[in-house]
């Protein structure tokens, strides 16, 4: 893979930062604020599991990536037009949510979730593709850090701030804030000029064939597909239970938002630059194993969460924050590997195809976690997460040569 890109300018960095923050604000709103609100209104774990399952629509972003690769760049650019379209769609969803009490209308709630997930998928796909054409290889580790820090900042906005607005001023104010944020992003996109980049040529049949042939290349292979599906699943399995478990331990929605959308992001913002330094100075292969191994004892500690809660009520939040820190250190490395294995001419398709697999594994794990927690209890569900983490660690070790190839061939 060639790497003849010039360094990104200030407008590129600004859009990558603000756009990534907005994207993860949507995630924070969906997975933290919305779930906490619904749990507070008496929704069961089985009902909440459907929210996670609908969220897996975002994994279909690879289909939107195919549309982006097939359509020639127009007057709005290769990715900018899609970003504008998605942001307009999201604005419509938040406008609808501001006008209707979705907590009392399950059908409308699910409709909003579907629309939110679909538009978020389009936005995330375009933003990831833009990152690939803007960032040269040497900046991708740092670009992964930017996205990870934006993820934490976005959760603070979409989770804690939205929950605070909801608890203090109601649903209209919370949805209105998200609408205002969307309109601000529209304004920035209108003034942004996307750099030129080559587009993939060929028919829809050729693009469909690429979805299969991508996994048959030496740098990927079907083993890479399995690894991407599994690598984030253990953490996602545990993370899906954070909101309902904190509620069951007696924490209010505002406290839950403070823990998950302020405590975790602030702690992660502090340690994330360390991951960027690691990415620039150490081989990805070593980092993957070292940072993944940090999760194992922390996942195991979750099986004792009830006992620790009896010792001190704030020990469970400390466990949750520590586990999230371990994943925060790993995430930039995963993002860098995804970009390494993406060709510039098919940036949106390659990166979105890979990240869609990661998301599909994460949302599937979250759906299963809530169902298992309802059926066998939180403690046994956390043991399942531990066993899953050990299995994934073994898969990483057996396929460690894949990390060597991406580093050697992307210089």
Give the ranges of each region predicted by the language model.
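Helix-to-loop junctions at the C-terminal end of transmembrane segments
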Residues: 61-77, 270-284, 373-374
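Glycine-rich segments within core transmembrane alpha-helices of 12-TM secondary carriers
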Residues: 61, 141-166, 355-366
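C-terminal ends and interior cores of transmembrane alpha-helices
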Residues: 84-103, 294-311
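Juxtamembrane intracellular "pre-TM" segments in multi-pass secondary transporters
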Residues: 2-9, 194-225
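A late C-terminal transmembrane helix in Major Facilitator Superfamily
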Residues: 345-376
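C-terminal transmembrane helical hairpin of 12-TM major facilitator-type secondary transporters
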Residues: 286-334
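Helix-loop boundary and gating motifs at the non-cytosolic
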Residues: 2-58, 222-227, 231-246
């Amino acid at each position: 893979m060639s790497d003849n890109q010039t360094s990104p300018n200030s407008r590129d960095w600004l859009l990558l930062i603000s756009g990534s923050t907005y994207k993860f604000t949507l995630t924070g709103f969906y997975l933290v604020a919305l779930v906490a609100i619904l749990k507070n209104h008496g929704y069961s774990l089985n009902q909440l599991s459907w929210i996670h399952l609908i969220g897996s629509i975002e994994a279909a972003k690879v289909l939107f990536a195919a549309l982006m690769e097939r359509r020639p760049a127009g007057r709005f650019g290769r990715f900018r037009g899609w970003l504008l379209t998605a942001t307009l769609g999201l604005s419509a969803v938040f406008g609808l949510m501001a006008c209707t009490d979705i907590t009392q209308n399950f059908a409308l709630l699910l409709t909003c979730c579907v629309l939110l997930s679909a538009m978020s998928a389009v936005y995330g796909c375009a933003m990831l593709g833009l990152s690939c054409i803007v960032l040269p290889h040497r900046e991708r580790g740092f670009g992964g850090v930017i996205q990870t820090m934006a993820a934490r900042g976005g959760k603070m906005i979409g989770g804690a701030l939205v929950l605070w607005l909801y608890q203090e001023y109601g649903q209209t104010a919370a949805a209105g804030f998200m609408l205002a944020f969307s309109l601000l992003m529209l304004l920035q996109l209108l003034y942004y000029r996307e750099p030129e980049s080559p587009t993939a040529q060929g028919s829809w049949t050729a693009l469909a064939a690429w979805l299969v042939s991508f996994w048959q290349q030496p740098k990927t292979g079907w083993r890479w597909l399995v690894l991407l599906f599994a690598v984030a699943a253990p953490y996602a399995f545990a993370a899906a239970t954070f909101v309902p478990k904190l509620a069951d331990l007696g924490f209010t929605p505002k406290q839950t938002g403070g823990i998950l959308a302020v405590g975790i992001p602030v702690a992660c913002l502090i340690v994330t630059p360390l991951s960027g330094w690691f990415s620039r100075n150490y081989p990805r292969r070593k980092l993957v194993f070292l940072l993944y191994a940090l999760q194992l004892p922390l996942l195991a500690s979750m099986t004792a969460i009830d006992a620790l809660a009896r010792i001190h009520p704030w020990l469970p939040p400390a466990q949750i924050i520590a586990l999230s820190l371990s994943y925060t250190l790993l995430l930039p490395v995963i993002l860098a590997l995804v970009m390494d294995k993406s060709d510039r001419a098919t940036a949106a398709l390659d990166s979105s195809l890979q990240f869609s697999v990661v998301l599909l594994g994460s949302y599937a794990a979250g759906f299963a976690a809530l169902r298992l927690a309802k059926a066998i209890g939180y403690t046994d569900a956390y043991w399942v997460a531990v066993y899953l983490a050990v299995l994934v660690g073994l898969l990483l070790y057996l396929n460690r040569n894949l990390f060597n190839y991406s580093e050697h061939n992307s210089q």
